Amino acid sequence: MFSVYTNDRIADAETDAISDPEKAAFVQRYEHLLEPIADVAYGLAVMIAIAGGPLALFLTFFPGVFWIFYASGWLDAFDGSLSRLKAVLVLNTTVVALAWAIVLTFLPVAFAGASLSPVVLFVFAYFFLRVFTFVELSNIPDTEGDRQIGVSTIPTVFGIRGTRHALYLLNGLTGAIVLGALQSGLTPLPVAGVLLLGTGYSLGVAALVGRWANISVLIQAAEGEYVLTYLALLATMLVV
């Protein structure tokens, strides 16, 4: 993911200069270092994946393939009317969330040699919704730049208030699938409690969208959900 996102930032450095000039300037200044580092990182990931077998190797290539369709203009070489998936409302975030959720869920399954199960599908749905939520929150600072380059996101189309309500909905859906998994016995109560705690934290961050002036701080706070959830899960495993 580091490799894919680094290459994405390099490819979009010019357009990112509109919404985040400091980040774009950093990427352009150190592109000669970032690009080979990203390539080496992907190469290492492929080498590690070989040990996990064909499925793990396939899943490792997944993010790179998704990036080609998501961020590059590669498809335009075949049909000039085709837009980058990155420019299509909801579909752009769906592609990112799918790429993350597929790798985070199924790569460990491939290494463990486990089979597909309802628990795995629950984990996939959970990761998909969490990534989708974070990506749309992260799109808020890019609103002006995205509008200028024709990229449609929830913030550009529905505004801050609409985005806040969308984040409420996404967090609500996450809570619903966690409760559903708990009720059906797919996850024990302590784990469900931790996941709901993280979702509640995210809901609190969403409530501040449009009401807290520094959106960068909110995004950093949203990233804290993963740390909070991980530490709480670790503590739960040590205690229970």
List the model feature ranges, each with a label:
Residues M1-V240:
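Multi-pass alpha-helical membrane architecture of UbiA-family
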